[in-house]
Structures are given as C-alpha cells and as structure tokens.
Amino acid sequence: MAKGKRFLVLTTDAFGGHGGIALYNRDLLLALCNFPGCSEVVAVPRSIPGPLEDERPNNLTYVTTGLHGKVKYVMAVLKVLRENPDFEFIVCGHINLLPIAHLVGVWLRKPILLFVYGIDVWQPSKRKLINKLIKNIAHFVSISEITKERFTKWAKLSDKKGSIIPNAIHMENYGAGDKNSRLISQYGLDGKTVLMTLGRLSADERYKGFDEIIELLPELIREISGIVYMIIGSGGDRERLQKKAMLLGVGGHVVFTGFVSESEKPDYYRLADAYVMPSYGEGFGFVFLEALACGIPVVASNIDGGREAVRHGKLGALVDPHDAEDIKKGILKALKQPRMIPEDLEYFSYSNFEQRVHRLVTEFAKD
C-alpha cells in the first residue's frame, strides 16, 4: 500500500484566529487535508488569539507549542521534524516566516510554497534576509492579481512563478434575512439607514477608508437625515476616529460596536443597508464576500484588491477612494439596490477554492 502524503504548514494563525488571513488559512488547511491521498497535514501556528472552538479535520495535527515567541516557535518546528521529516513540501503561510521555512526546506531538500496576501508584500520587506530568500521559493500563491503584480515587480520574480487563489466564502454560514430586532434596539437603529465597515481600528490599517466615510457624513446627512455609519472592530485608532466624528459634528451618526465574534457577524452584516469600504491598500477584501453572502449591497475600491472581491464591478459598486464625490455616488447607488445574494458569488465558494488548491498541490506532490 502506498504511503499517504504529508504536508507541513508554517502559518501565523488559523484555527482560533480572527480576520481574513486566519480564515484563509483555515480553508487552506481543510483543502490540504481533503487532498486525495493525504494522510496528514501538520500545521504550526505562530499564534492562537482565541479559543480553539472550531472543529478540525481528523488528519490535521495542529501544533500548539510554538506560541509566545520566536524561540518556542522554532523549537516546535524542530520537534515536528525530528518526529517525522517526511513531507512533500513546505507551505510558508506568511512572508515573515520565510527564514524558518527556508531552513526547513534546505534541511529536508523540499520545495517551499509561499502564500502572500496584501500590503505586507506590496513593497520590499524591512528585513533584508527575507528579500534575499524570496528567490529560493519554488512557487507563490497570491489571494489577488494586484498583490501578485506588486510582489513580482519588486521581488523580480517570473509571472509564471505565481498563482492566484482568492478567498473562499462558506455560504452556509451566512444568508439573507431581516435585521435583528435586538441589535436594532441595542444600537438605536430603528428607522435608520445604515452604512457599515468592518475592520481592525489600527493606525496601520487606515487605508480601509474609515476616515473617508466619516468625512463624507455631513454631506450624506443632508440628503439622508437618518443615516448612520456603523464601524465594527476594535483597536487603538478608535479614539481618534471618535474625536474626528465629534469635531465634524457627526458623532451621533457614528456607531462603534467594538469586537464582534465570527458567530455574530451575519446578524451584524444584516443591519447594513450598504457595506462600504473605499480602501486603498486592501489585498483582497474578504469582508465584501461576507456582506454579499448576507444579501447586502457593497461599495468597493477600484484601485486595490477590493475590485477583485466584487469581480470588477460585477458584484458591487466600484469607486475611487480618493474622490469623495465618487464615493458618495457609489453609496447612493448601493442604497437603491435590493437586498439579495448575487448568483455570481458562487465563484468564491469553498468547493471552487478547494479545487484550485488541489490543482496547485498536484504540481508539487507528484509521485
């Protein structure tokens, strides 16, 4: 009997993590576990921010001893290699993990498959070693065309050395529906027109467009008096955004919810009349898929990965994030759209994601 294939995945986070990259990594691990002939996937996460409540595949070994520092992470990887070094290839789940992935690749004499996401690879790394090691990867996977283009340009990689596998949306976890009456009461949204953006409130992620929507509110209020901007997420930039809203006289029209769990997200998305994120540094924009899967019209940027999430305007409105008037037009257009889940969202289904991963793995796991 032929032995099963084993894959080693070095990743930032997946199960127990939050955000688009963690969700992507979960789907990637599931797809690898479902690859025909796969006997085991060994994943070593760098962090596990939340509880490990998600159900995991039986053939996934999720190593939890590499948390809390680089030394512990390296030791966890070494322990995996000592126990059984027989892997088909190494998946490097983030460019910052490339140094350790490179060492493992040299030791095992196996190829490295690097996954890249967004602004983290749009320009050279501040760590010169990482920039040097990029030429040694066998292949890379980007979640979007724009990230692939920017990465190959500065890294001087052949276009053929990269593939695109966008995020997946698990439609069964979402669905269209009425606004949740409890949440309407909790946030005082009865009779309000709700715009929404979800994301980490960090100085490093101001490119998501929170400021642009707040600055546009005075003008929007003149046209729609009951309009409210709901910002979902937590982070150190919240206080600055709150002060900005107050200074502009729209403090009463901006609602900050704080952190919202994955299980609560669908009910929150359904509160929106339009999901708006005029970003200028988003690698893809998984939140657009989530909003669309809840039947919410969306407004995305025409200059970053958001345009790919809405399939270049097929699934939602595209606007110039640096043009306030264009953003306003996009919002007003979205507010006139019916609440419905577009059929073309199936393009991003998990089954299609898994097929894309399996086609890629076939090239790296040949007998």
Regions found by a protein language model. Give the residues of each.
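Conserved donor-binding/catalytic core segment of Leloir-type glycosyltransferases
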Residues: 10, 189-208, 214-217
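Short His-centered aromatic/hydrophobic patch
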Residues: 92-98
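Carbohydrate-associated surface elements
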Residues: 146, 168
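Short alpha-helical donor nucleotide-sugar binding micro-motif in glycosyltransferases
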Residues: 259-260, 267-272
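Aromatic "clamp/platform" in nucleotide-sugar-dependent glycosyltransferases that forms part
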Residues: 280
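Short hydrophobic beta-strand element within catalytic cores of glycosyltransferases
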Residues: 297-300
